[in-house]
Amino acid sequence: GLGDVYKRQAKLYLTYQDRFPTSDLASQTVDQIGRVTPPDNGYRARAYNHTVRADAEGYAYASLLNEELQLGATVKFRADTLDKFNLWKCLRKRDYVIGLEPCNCRTWGRDKAREHGDLVMLEPMESKDFYLELQVHDGAEELRVAAARYDGCL
């Protein structure tokens, strides 16, 4: 089922411009970011922040695709309002999780975001609309079409 899509050597994809590992461990393992491996008791959680790259229609994408199971999922979102993406991985037994998080801020906290001019604030009575779409892929052809929008696996 779809709950197993992340198992058995699934791959992660993202339309992005820049990557910012959030720790020394994340920096040291950046070459492994796109691979999803079986549970490992020694695995330590790591996170990567990204600035996304929009397509011609203004959308960015992140996918988790598993060719072996011929299943996958893609999150599609507007890059003008959700211009960043956080990827969090913990592939440890009992804590086996991947977070695919379109967002408008990095995970470094409000103070650092304010310091870098990245803190998004709404004015009183202001509202903002966000667009997010979840796509489920079933079968080899749907996976091929989903993977074609990327330059390659993370």
Task: Go through each PLM region and give its residues.
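Active-site/ligand-binding surface loops and adjacent short beta/alpha elements
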Residues: 7-79
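Active-site pocket scaffolds in enzymes
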Residues: 68-154
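Short, small-residue-biased leader/transition segments that mark boundaries at the very start
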Residues: 1-6
